[in-house]
Design a protein with these regions (language model features):
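Sec-dependent N-terminal signal peptides of Gram-positive bacterial secreted proteins and lipoproteins
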Residues: 1-23
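Subset-of-secretome marker
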Residues: 23-149
Length: 149
């Protein structure tokens, strides 16, 4: 009976451990990069990035520009994402700052990578582990949840 109970406990631990693998998870990172306040949320499964949403806030004074110059700057980004199915891109222009919203949760990653000029090995998916290293290298810190406060 003791052996049976031990076996059941071990089996339950294995089931719980295995069910945690392969589960979708989301992590959020925040920090300042090149004059932008970046807030990004990444959903991944195992090492595959499934979706990413980013909010970039740029204060005009920090970049030495006014609202009109910021519109020209963002027009370049907008042209990259324009007409790319599955990408939501918009910029809210406020009096002293611009807030850029980028959400490519439903995009075909191969098409996005091609549009951005990014080549992934054999057109494979984006590695969460590599992306996380890049974000941390750029000074972003993990955050509990995504809000633009």
């Amino acid at each position: 009976m003791k052996k049976l109970c031990s076996l059941i406990v071990v089996a339950l631990i294995c089931i719980i451990a295995l069910s945690a693998c392969g589960k979708e998870q989301t992590k959020t990172y925040e920090g300042d990069v090149s004059g932008k306040h970046v807030l990004t949320s990444i959903t991944y499964k195992d090492d595959k990035v499934l979706k990413q949403s980013t909010i970039n806030t740029i204060k005009y004074d920090d970049l030495g520009m006014d609202k009109d110059e910021a519109k020209k700057l963002f027009a370049k980004s907008e042209s990259i994402f324009k007409d790319l199915k599955g990408v939501k891109y918009k910029v809210d222009y406020k009096d002293k700052k611009a807030i850029e919203h980028l959400d490519y949760t439903e995009v075909d990653m191969k098409k996005l990578n091609k549009r951005l000029g990014v080549s992934t090995k054999e057109n494979k998916d984006i590695s969460f582990e590599k992306l996380e290293k890049q974000l941390k290298h750029r000074g972003l810190k993990e955050k509990d949840k995504m809000d633009d406060k």
